[in-house]
């Protein structure tokens, strides 16, 4: 079994590319995942390279940005390639099978949504309409 589940923050904006020929979308990014323990009172993190393919890659690139929290489930994959200097390089990365956006949008969008939810009231409570607009209904008019 090869299964990985991570929750962390993007270290920079995802990089979106398309494969030559088929044009399949592929996004790559690094996820900073906090460790469960602290060293000398400081939180430590691991920086995990992630690759996601297809529509999920496009959505990730379009809606996620540096610092946003996201969940990833997938598998660990290792590969190697020959670098330009002739040396053999080895890469270990997570190939995402599922991504979840746990935070998205800008802080301006979030505050605008909160303003709409709060209906412009400073203390956050919803303003009710005036009673003058309410028409009483006779129970006999209800068809059930």
Curated annotation (Swiss-Prot):
Alphabetized InterPro entries for the sequence: NA-bd_OB-fold, Primosome_PriB/ssb, ssDNA-bd
Biased composition (Polar residues): 112-134
Keyword line: DNA-binding
Residue span of region Disordered: 112-144
GO molecular function: single-stranded DNA binding
Pfam family, one: SSB
Residue stretches making up the SSB domain: 1-103
GO cellular component: nucleoid
Superkingdom of the organism of origin: Bacteria
GO BP of this protein: DNA replication
Cross-referenced NCBIfam families: ssb
HAMAP family associated with the record: SSB
Assembly with partners or alone: Homotetramer.
Name of the protein in its database record: Single-stranded DNA-binding protein 3
Gene from which the chain derives: ssb3
